[in-house]
């Protein structure tokens, strides 16, 4: 997952084949496990937030809950946006590196990061990047509600981070504003606990679907690397000697 690809032949019998569950170069586990850790952190943050909100609500019963929880819900949306970025960027880089030379290339990594920049925080640009690089159209594999929820998470996150959680002209130009306009109480936007639950559900759906798309593409590209390794060895006798 860091761009290092190695061939480790464990056994010639198919029934005994095995593989590492981590990268022996950088120590990272899979992108999916990394996302699972992010989701676990989100659950911890959400749990602590709900305890805090309940405690404050008992002392401020006259204040609407969404106002008391405004900052808490913003933190949770930012965390969901981080999960989305990890999902798209890490899977993209893993597929790209295994498609290239079977070794880490720092120059290639710099080119990728320079070209993509923060594009993986833009859902529509992400769809375009995957389509151009791998022929994968993410949008076609997600239902309309999930796609819109991902857009909403990122647009809300941008408003929260860049304008202190207050509705601005840039946010008003987004599709999210059109879907949430009944929630707007200038300069704030009304976010409820149910909204967070719905957005989380869509993130989990997206993680599941995109992870399956990734695995299908990954195995195909991995097998090409392995086949290319064997069929392009300089000396066929060396190949058979290595397998003895």
State the predicted function of each range.
Residues 34-63:
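Intrinsically disordered, low-complexity segments
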Residues 70-96, 161:
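Short, hydrophobic, well-ordered secondary-structure elements
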Residues 79, 83, 149-159, 195-198, ...:
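Charged, amphipathic alpha-helical oligomerization/scaffolding segments
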Residues 55-77, 132-145:
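A long, hydrophobic alpha-helical segment
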Residues 1, 13, 96-185:
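Flexible secondary-structure boundary motifs
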Residues 25-30, 66-70, 107-113:
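Short, charged, low-complexity loops and linkers
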Residues 89-100, 212, 216-219:
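Perimembrane helix-loop junctions in membrane proteins
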Residues 1-44, 166-244:
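Polyanionic, low-complexity intrinsically disordered segments
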């Amino acid at each position: 997952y860091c761009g290092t690809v190695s061939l480790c032949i464990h056994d010639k019998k198919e029934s005994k084949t095995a593989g590492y569950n981590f990268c022996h170069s950088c120590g990272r586990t899979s992108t999916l496990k990394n996302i699972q850790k992010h989701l676990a952190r989100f659950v911890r943050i959400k749990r602590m937030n709900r305890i805090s909100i309940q405690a404050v609500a008992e002392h401020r019963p006259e204040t609407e809950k969404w106002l008391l929880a405004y900052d808490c819900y913003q933190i949770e949306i930012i965390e969901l946006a981080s999960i989305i970025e990890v999902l798209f960027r890490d899977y993209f880089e893993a597929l790209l590196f295994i498609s290239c030379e079977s070794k880490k290339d720092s120059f290639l990594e710099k080119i990728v990061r320079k070209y993509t920049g923060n594009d993986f925080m833009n859902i529509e640009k992400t769809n375009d990047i995957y389509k151009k690089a791998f022929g994968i159209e993410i949008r076609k594999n997600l239902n309309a509600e999930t796609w819109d929820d991902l857009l909403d998470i990122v647009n809300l996150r941008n408003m929260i981070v860049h304008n202190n959680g207050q509705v601005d002209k840039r946010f008003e130009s987004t599709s999210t504003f059109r879907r949430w306009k009944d929630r707007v109480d200038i300069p704030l936007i009304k976010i409820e606990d149910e909204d967070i639950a719905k957005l989380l559900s869509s993130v989990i759906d997206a993680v599941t679907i995109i992870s399956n798309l990734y695995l299908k593409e990954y195995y195909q590209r991995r097998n090409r690397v392995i086949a290319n390794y064997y069929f392009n060895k300089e000396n066929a006798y060396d190949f058979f000697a290595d397998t003895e």
